[in-house]
């Protein structure tokens, strides 16, 4: 979130497109201490937006999360790009705020942007604090599997390479100022 470093990077390289994936993402950490989430997810995004505007990039793609929409349980209607935001924790609130900054730069300064809200990624080298690695490691170690709440929350899972393909398609063919909901229709409750 250091604007000087961001500016220098834009200055030294001929950057024409930004795909913004940088974020603090672990919900539990955001509940314990939200400061890093404010710095990285909100101020970090703001600094990238300022540099993107200054250096007149051709496209700014912001990768966000479906967590900004709240949560789903069995029988609930699926999220869509028109679903109102309903963040339920400091992490999702910080991502919702960064989404709003991107949209504000688009409408105020005409920054060419696209935005995607993606479901839960899984795949190689996933951080050990994420849900699937925690469950797998708990099983391997003979530990109790942690379940949040009653385990009824629904998560859609997407393989990381499929998410990357979606980002590329949005970056190259997406319509400016549009939001794209990225998922795989692989919905499971935490208990499943």
Which sequence ranges carry the predicted segments?
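Conserved mid-core alpha-helix of short-chain dehydrogenase/reductase
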Residues: 5, 47-51, 157, 162-165, ...
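Generic recognition of well-ordered alpha-helical segments
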Residues: 21, 101, 134, 166-169
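Hydrophobic pocket-lining residues that define ligand/cofactor binding sites across diverse proteins
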Residues: 52, 106, 139, 170-171
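Glycine/proline-rich active-site loop of Rossmann-fold NAD(P)-dependent oxidoreductases
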Residues: 96, 114, 121-134, 141-143, ...
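Amphipathic, non-transmembrane alpha-helical scaffold segments
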Residues: 38-41, 91, 136, 183, ...
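N-terminal Rossmann-like NAD(P)+-binding domain of SDR-like oxidoreductases, especially those catalyzing
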Residues: 1-121
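Residue-level signal for the nucleotide or nucleotide-sugar donor/cofactor binding architecture
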Residues: 1, 32, 40-43, 82, ...
């Amino acid at each position: 979130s250091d604007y000087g470093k961001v500016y220098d990077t834009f200055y030294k390289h001929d950057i024409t497109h930004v795909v913004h994936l940088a974020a603090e993402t672990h919900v539990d950490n955001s509940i314990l201490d939200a400061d890093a989430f404010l710095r990285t997810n909100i101020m970090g995004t703001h600094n990238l937006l300022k540099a993107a505007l200054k250096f007149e990039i051709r496209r700014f793609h912001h990768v966000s999360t479906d967590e900004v929409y709240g949560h789903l349980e069995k029988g609930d209607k699926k999220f869509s790009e028109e679903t109102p935001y309903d963040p339920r924790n400091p992490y999702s609130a910080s991502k919702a705020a960064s989404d709003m900054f991107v949209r504000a730069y688009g409408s105020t300064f005409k920054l060419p942007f696209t935005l995607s809200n993606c479901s839960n990624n899984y795949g190689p080298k996933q951080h050990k604090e994420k849900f699937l690695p925690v469950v797998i490691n708990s099983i391997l170690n003979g530990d109790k599997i942690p379940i949040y709440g009653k385990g009824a929350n629904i998560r859609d899972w997407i393989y990381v390479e499929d998410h990357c393909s979606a980002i590329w398609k949005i970056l190259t063919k997406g319509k400016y100022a549009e939001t794209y909901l990225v998922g795989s229709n692989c919905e499971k409750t935490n208990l499943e």
